[in-house]
């Protein structure tokens, strides 16, 4: 709110200078900062230098010890620096993460084309198939279907052919009790 009415470059330089204070911030301030940076990027064109400053500051520490910070920072870094961030997120997904975290990351990875190897795409679609078998809220099946549709649309015909078995495989659902 305090930034309204200030010059665009003042906003950016003031906000970006906070990157040096990142480690000193309490988590609530880190979340506020991430949100402000995300809004700045979505509403204004920022220079390549400013993007690099954000990537350098937030990306060098990713993944963080905090799941919540990871979930807030990952979408921003996937957008700004997919070639470095996507492999880190895929590795994170291979580890022990909750269903909520996994679906969150799959959602944000769905449209990325940079930073994804054929192997990482296999991992992505295997995890997506796994989550498609889990019980969830009413909208979960539709959300996962949309993630599958959008992520499949990013594949080239060659990749679709190479991933044919992974794309077609769906783990069997457990039997419902009588």
Regions found by a protein language model. Give the residues of each.
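Long, ordered, helix-rich scaffold segments
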Residues: 1-178
């Amino acid at each position: 709110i305090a930034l309204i009415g200030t010059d665009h470059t003042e906003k950016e330089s003031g906000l970006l200078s906070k990157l040096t204070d990142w480690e000193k911030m309490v988590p609530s301030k880190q979340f506020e900062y991430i949100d402000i940076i995300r809004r700045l990027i979505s509403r204004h064109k920022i220079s390549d230098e400013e993007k690099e400053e954000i990537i350098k500051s937030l990306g060098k520490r990713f993944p963080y010890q905090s799941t919540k910070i990871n979930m807030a920072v990952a979408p921003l870094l996937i957008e700004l620096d997919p070639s470095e961030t996507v492999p880190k997120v895929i590795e994170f997904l291979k580890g022990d993460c909750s269903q909520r975290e996994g679906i969150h990351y799959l959602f944000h990875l769905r449209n990325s084309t940079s930073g994804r190897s054929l192997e990482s795409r296999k991992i992505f679609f295997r995890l997506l198939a796994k989550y498609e078998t889990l019980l969830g809220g009413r909208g979960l099946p539709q959300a996962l279907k949309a993630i599958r549709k959008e992520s499949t649309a990013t594949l080239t015909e060659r990749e679709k052919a190479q991933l044919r078995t992974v794309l077609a495989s769906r783990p069997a659902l457990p039997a419902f009790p009588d």
